[in-house]
């Protein structure tokens, strides 16, 4: 309920501000694109920065399958089914935008005693790794749909072809690694370097490179980064509210939200065959949308009209279904045996988002 409130309340305030000020056409402003890119950068870096690498290695096959095959499968199930139902290829893009599991919301349920430590570790890594994958997919899906519909391409960062952007991400990762190698013994310098990398990623839109850098650029800024990610979530929800003055598409939003949750059920069960039944059920019902889905919808709105009108109610639908489904599941389930295992990815003011300052 708290996670849902962090979405609904700022969005409601944003909507009230938009009505009071008569704000409109914000998505066409260069400042709008800059702000949404900053929010995306903070969210992605926070996602991978918080992954507990030692625990993720234990189930790396399941995690890799979830964030590659799983994300592609979920995006295809959602996008293709709705594109056919509504006869609109834009749903191929929207399917990608909601295909990830929100890491902040997932962290809030990791304390569930009915989930085993292994399932918690898988969910934490899954929800963190799938964010950069969906960002990458959304960029390419948006380009394909924009070309098919004759919509101008969204100009961000390095520009040029997507091959150029891929090359820019590779260079970014190389620079990040060299910086880590030279600065790993200087914590304060490493913290400044991390901020510089975020700024560079915003400038050149090298979000995949930034997400990879979060796996090894890990200065002692856990508390500050946690606050920044929470602020980015609230800021993104507020901006979402600012753009809701033109109304929402309730029917399409219901369909998108239901399809996103159904896709997680299908993929979650398919990829966790070796886990106990209780863990499989919790992972299958783990779909929640939050910061990444909101920010992707903000970016896509600058290119396609009507994106937020569909995605905003879809996010609400997904999170309400999650709340109801997991409440019913927990009433029937019994607590899993306790084990003294450090929990991966803890969101919140006092969370430890990073456990290592260097890769192993």
Roles of regions detected by a PLM:
Residues 1-359:
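Transmembrane helical cores of multi-pass secondary ion antiporters/exchangers
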């Amino acid at each position: 309920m708290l996670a849902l409130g962090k979405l609904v309340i700022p969005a409601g305030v944003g909507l009230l501000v938009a009505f009071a000020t008569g704000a409109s056409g914000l998505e066409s402003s260069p400042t709008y694109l800059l702000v949404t890119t900053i929010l995306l950068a903070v969210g992605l870096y926070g996602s991978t920065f918080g992954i507990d690498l030692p625990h993720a290695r234990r189930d790396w096959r399941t995690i890799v399958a979830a964030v590659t095959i799983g994300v592609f499968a979920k995006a295809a199930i959602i996008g293709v089914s709705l594109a056919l139902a509504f006869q609109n290829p834009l749903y191929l893009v929207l399917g990608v935008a909601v295909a990830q599991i929100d890491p902040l919301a997932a962290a809030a349920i990791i304390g569930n005693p009915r989930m085993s430590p292994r399932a918690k570790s898988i969910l934490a890594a899954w929800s963190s790794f799938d964010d950069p994958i969906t960002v990458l997919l959304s960029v390419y899906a948006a380009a394909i749909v924009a070309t098919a519909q004759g919509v101008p391409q969204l100009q961000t960062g390095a520009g040029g072809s997507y091959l150029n952007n891929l090359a820019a991400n590779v260079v970014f990762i190389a620079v990040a690694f060299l910086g880590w190698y030279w600065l790993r013994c200087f914590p304060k310098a490493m913290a400044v370097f991390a901020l510089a990398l975020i700024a560079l990623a915003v400038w050149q839109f090298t979000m995949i490179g930034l997400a990879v850098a979060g796996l090894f650029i890990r200065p002692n800024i856990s508390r500050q980064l946690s606050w920044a990610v929470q602020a980015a979530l609230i800021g993104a929800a507020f901006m979402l509210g600012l753009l809701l003055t033109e109304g929402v598409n309730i029917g399409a939003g219901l369909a998108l939200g239901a399809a996103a949750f159904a896709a997680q059920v299908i993929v979650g069960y398919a990829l966790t065959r070796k886990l106990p039944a209780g863990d499989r059920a919790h992972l299958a019902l783990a779909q929640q949308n939050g910061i990444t889905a909101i920010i992707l919808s903000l970016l896509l709105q600058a290119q396609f009209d009507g994106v937020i009108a569909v995605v905003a109610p879809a996010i609400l639908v997904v999170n309400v279904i999650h709340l109801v489904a997991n409440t019913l599941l927990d009433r029937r389930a019994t607590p899993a045996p306790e084990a003294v295992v450090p929990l991966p990815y803890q969101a919140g003011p006092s969370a430890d988002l990073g456990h290592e300052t260097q890769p192993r």
